[in-house]
Amino acid sequence: MLTVIKRSGRTEPLDISKIKKYTSESVKDLDNVSLSELEVDAKIQFRDQITTTEIQQTLIKTAVDKIDVDRPNWTFVAARLFLYDLYHRVNGFSGYGHLRDYFNRGEKEGRIVLGLKDKYDLDDLNSYIDVRRDLQFTYLGVKTLHDRYLLKNRKGEPIELPQHMFMAIAMFLAQNELNSQDWAKKFYDLISKFEVMPATPTLSNARTPRHQLSSCYIGSTPDNIEGIFDSFKEMSLLSKYGGGIGWDWSLVRAMGGMIDGHKNAAGGVIPFLKITNDIAVAVDQLGTRKGAIAVYIEPWHMDISDFLDLKKNSGEERRRTHELFPSLWINDLFMKRIEQDAMWTLFDPADTPDLCELYGEEFDKRYEEYEKNPNIPKEFVKAKELWKKVLTNYFESGSPFLCFKDNANRANPNNHTGIIRSSNLCTEIFQNTQPNHYVIKVVFNNGEVRLFEEDEDIKTDDGIVKKAKKITALDTLDGKTIFIVEKDVKEGKTAVCNLASINLSKVNTQEDIKRVVPIAVRMLDNVIDLNFYPHSKVKRTNLLSRSIGLGVMGEAQMLAEQSIAWGGYDHLAKIDEIMEAISYNAIKASSNLSLEKGAYPEFEGSKWSKGIFPIDAANENTKRLVDRGGLFGYTHDWEKLREKVKKDGMRNGYLMAIAPTSSISILVGTTQTIEPVYKRKWFEENLSGMIPVTAPKLSPDTWGFYTPAYELDQKLLIQAGAVRQKWIDQGQSLNIFITLDKASGKYLND
């Protein structure tokens, strides 16, 4: 008699019927898969004392190897087999235990925040959980969930199952609601049905003691050593807790600039970016991956040429930053000079700092004044040659990322409180930031403290007038002896965004959008108050603007299932209709929340407060891409909504942004964000090897509508982006797919 060794170490007689039970369940109700084929091809070599783990892994691998374009459903077979294995690993039996047992175990392991379960009726929520929703997972989706999101004990073993995880996240995000039990169920339904998925930090950390839920941060560095090193500290803290970072360096003086009256003293921005690069490597994200930091400068900065060389493999290594993502913050004037084949002037920001504070016509006017000023040091370059260098690097390395300053700021709903200086790592978040401001702090021997601006004129007791930054402890003021002079910081603004994405493959009708969007907006708004903030400046900024970023994913799958060709007119019309509905319902939901919980503190004076919406920033060329009946027509009652917002306010200063969704789209088994598929079949590298993946719901009916990205006219991607952008107050992470034959010098010269 053959025996089998269970996970517990216990030995029992081998029972083939138990194996058949699991294999039968794994193929149930799936087309074009075969139980006999699975069992025969597994070729399990039964022997005495074979382990159940070995049997299970053999079956899983057999199913995975069968995934192909003509039989995509094998991914669900593999997922079910993996889940059966996971149930046993977590619970010791096939299925779910009680929600209370899950919480007790998680608290004991120190992985679930104490007290959360005490705020709810666990018996009620346990009965609400629908374990059948596990059947939605593809194999790569459930593997991603297991490897990246499920809580583990100190040995690295999973201690939660998917539906418990989704319910715990929902409970965490609903805990401050007056009727938290009901809202937990609504949040759970959205997440567990794969209708809306929060971003990775929320999935990973909501329910845990270290509940850092935000995806990305955006900051700015001032032009002084205190501010530069405070930026290093801030970036380190943000990276430590898993945030992606976008950071503006445009204010830092160029190489060869003056410092304290000394010529050629400044080393420029590059040495500081080298330190930033080392921070990204040294301060990894909770040990899971290296930090991810995008660094931005404007194209008039004198260090622009060296900046574009940051990722080159040749040259002086001390001036290379292979782990950073260089990004350009481009103004319209630069693009006009390229079109005109004109000259472009480079400045040291120490001489022209207000260029960072201006955009549009005001920037153009000031920039041209500096060009004409003979007292301002400057360098000249042909705009087209600089642009050619940008594109050469772009084609060779994928960087610099390109973002457009004037467009971002013209659409900024909160331009009354500042300026957008850069975007984030993934170039979809556009919010106001402000570098720290430093003042001179004079501490007297009697304990009195006085603050001065650095260039403020101060008259000492001996009658000498000095700049405040030149005051020392040898001076006396008003008969008082100075103990020490140091710099004090007035913190600026570091923007933060909390993201979630609507799965368009499941939510694409007016009825579903109207149902789903208000729940998603409330869920994201709750993230703001429940978040762990790594830095006080980040929390203060987020509470002032209450920024969220509701986006979409699964666009390509939705189009394929509805037999709509990518980039055709029907595509533009469909996405225009959907994005309008999302925009309308998101704005309405935020206004309703404002009525219930209060408007964001910076609402007064915003474009929202004046009834100005994202659609009002759309240009006529974009509007003409889709015929809405005349030049432009409405599907929703926008005028009524404008009046409502002016009257009731907005809960969130920033509302919509389309993120890349690289991990969460895999988790829910749909196509990434707004992008076409790269291929109809490809392989994803995983810890367990290469996993075959096919486009979602691939069939003879959808095959022709899954056009690979590299086969498309890339202008179609830009047109689709323009249609979406009409309805978005922030931005969208948009990729362009270029093959090597289209990135040659010939095309650059053309």
Predicted features along the sequence, with ranges:
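Core nucleic-acid recognition elements
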Residues: 10, 33-170, 182-188
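A structural-propensity feature for long, helix-poor, extended segments
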Residues: 38-48, 52, 254-293, 486-496, ...
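A glycine-rich phosphate-binding loop feature that marks nucleotide/adenosyl-phosphate handling sites
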Residues: 41-42, 60-63, 78-84, 190, ...
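Core structural elements
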Residues: 50, 65, 137-152, 191-205, ...
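Active-site cavity-forming subdomains of large catalytic enzyme subunits
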Residues: 85, 91-132, 214-501, 507-509, ...
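Catalytic alpha/beta core of large soluble enzyme barrels
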Residues: 118-126, 130-144, 430-431, 524, ...
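Conserved oxyanion/phosphate-binding beta-strand-loop segments in alpha/beta enzyme cores
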Residues: 128-148, 176-209, 236, 712-721
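Internal maturation/activation junctions in enzymes
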Residues: 201, 517-539, 543, 565-661, ...
